[in-house]
Amino acid sequence: MISLREFIFSNNVNKYISKEDLYSLFIIIELTSKIIHNYIILNNITRIKQEKIKKNIHGEHQTKLDLLSNKKFIDMIKTHYNIAGIASEEEAKFISFKQEKYGKYIFLIDPLDGSLSADCNTPVGTIFSLYCRVTPIGVEISEKDFLQPGNKQILSGYILYGSSTILVFTVKSGVHIFTYHPFFSTFFLSKKNFNYPKKNNIYSINEANYNNFSLGIKKYIMSCKSNNNISSRYTGSLVADFHRNLIKGGIYLYPNTKIYKHGKLRLMYECNPIALISSQANGSSSDGNINILDINPKILHQCSPFFVGTKSMVKLVNKFILGYYNHN
């Protein structure tokens, strides 16, 4: 078995981050993920999550489980000597750390995606990414350090808390999958340089919103239903749905609707990290028009339609969307 530490120090990482910086970051992520997993387990015993505390910047209810996970990740990430600041889906503004003038990197995170389903024992996840700052070393960081397109990410990944705890990440040199070993209390390599399978097996979309979809999306769904080789699978947990489609071969769709005209998923915290993993696994992503990774963000909490999966399935859904654009 190859541990996460052994893997990092025995393989080349990208030119933007040293092995020491990468490993020290993953020590923090690994430790925090263990704590978050315990929060989730305790949630089903003590119901720590049930009370809806307040609404976040997106107008969504935050639960105690959201707030605990968010605080823990912020407190842990700020201990990394080279990270200047963090932006979280649960925070209105980015947070700078005391080492902001000299930290090389900025960190973005969705601390607990799918948390509202945690009490149903549905798999939930943490999504994260890392960028090099664009402001000069020696000055305070600013919002422009965070407002970079997804193709500028130097690391992205997610942790899936399910039947096992899984870490999936890329440093732009392939996608690597690690599984947490509870006896050794660390992650071990499960799959190296993983790519989507060649078959297109699954489409994942919330069809309860069907009446609010554009004609192109409706036609695409109909084409999937008419194909006996494609099945529909949807849990409502982005990380769980994407991970299944990555392993089995498929596409995840969250289009804009009449209610969410600009989409609902967050570009910086959800779409970009997942899109980079998809790209590195020989897949693709789109907002229905252009590659997600090529979008220049204008605001920190920007939303976007999101289509991510195998290249052929993403290409086809783009074709349907553009083909029926003037018929909506």
Swiss-Prot record:
It comes from the Bacteria. Its main location: cytoplasm. GO terms for molecular function: fructose 1,6-bisphosphate 1-phosphatase activity; magnesium ion binding. Binds 2 magnesium ions per subunit. Pathway: Carbohydrate biosynthesis; gluconeogenesis. Gene3D superfamilies: 3.40.190.80, Fructose-1,6-Bisphosphatase, subunit A, domain 1. It catalyses: beta-D-fructose 1,6-bisphosphate + H2O = beta-D-fructose 6-phosphate + phosphate. Substrate binds at N206, Y234, Y252, L253, Y254, K264. It is found in: Cytoplasm. The keyword Magnesium applies. InterPro entries: FBPase_C_dom (IPR044015), FBPase_class-1 (IPR000146), FBPase_N (IPR033391), FBPtase (IPR028343). Its cofactor is Mg(2+). GO terms for biological process: fructose 1,6-bisphosphate metabolic process; fructose 6-phosphate metabolic process; fructose metabolic process; gluconeogenesis; sucrose biosynthetic process. It holds the Pfam family FBPase. Keywords: Carbohydrate metabolism, Cytoplasm, Hydrolase, Magnesium, Metal-binding. SUPFAM superfamilies: Carbohydrate phosphatase (SSF56655). Mg(2+) 1 binds at E89, D110, L112. Its EC number is 3.1.3.11. Mg(2+) 2 binds at D110, D113, E270. Belongs to the FBPase class 1 family. HAMAP family: FBPase_class1. Homotetramer. This is Fructose-1,6-bisphosphatase class 1. It comes from Wigglesworthia glossinidia brevipalpis. The gene is fbp.
